[in-house]
Amino acid sequence: MPAIDLARLKKQTARLADSFDQPSVFLRELREILEFYVNRTLRSQSVAPSSVLPTYRTPVVVLRQIEKELGSLAERQPVRALGLADALWDEGWLETKLIAAFLLGRIPPQEERLLARLTAWTQAVRDPEVRAALLTTSLTRLRRETPDLFLILVKEWLHPARQRMWSNGIQALMPLISSPDFDNLPPIFEIVEPILKTSPATLQYDLQELIIVLFEASPDETTFFLQEIIKGTRNPLPSVALRRMAPKLPQELQISLREILRQANTRTR
């Protein structure tokens, strides 16, 4: 791989941005850039790649410069941005899917096809890096500018009939809960309550992460919420799941849960 000349890279990506409204031309020029900066040393390593997608092993600085050139264009031209994102997604490489996910995050939430695209792509994704990008970067403007619409989308993902989407829904909530500007936890509790009452073993890690983030945001509200979950269901799975998670939870919450679970056990005798 040639050493990265930032001046040259800026010229290459500026030229690439000129083809923003011509997906076929854009893809051709993007391939040339990715091939130019391909890290063949990493490609030839015998270790298994972390991605399940074909990849150029593009240096992060190259992808960030491409995103920098495209971000404002996507904001000003959302329809064309969505068309380009579709073409990039269909191209099927790790890098093209990551750029597509980035573009979704710059498209105004009012674009009517955005929510459908987010749902379709998150349902189909298998690569962990692309999945993470879709659940964070792609939801940036929706989460920040229209939190009510964002929560409607996540509630759809957490519908009882869409269990394959539950993990995505939980992970999508994390950045919102962690945001210092967000302090409205009751709607979050309402959305995740049915999932916690079910507590499937396959979601233990996701639920553990969720509880930690909720507790960091509001210890008292989260402790009370978990207490009501335990008191309000005859299903033993929430109690079983919380006992398994307890060693990984904050110490203060562990102490509270121990007492909550002891009281629940006493009531069932």
Predicted features along the sequence, with ranges:
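Alpha-helical scaffold domains
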Residues: 1-269
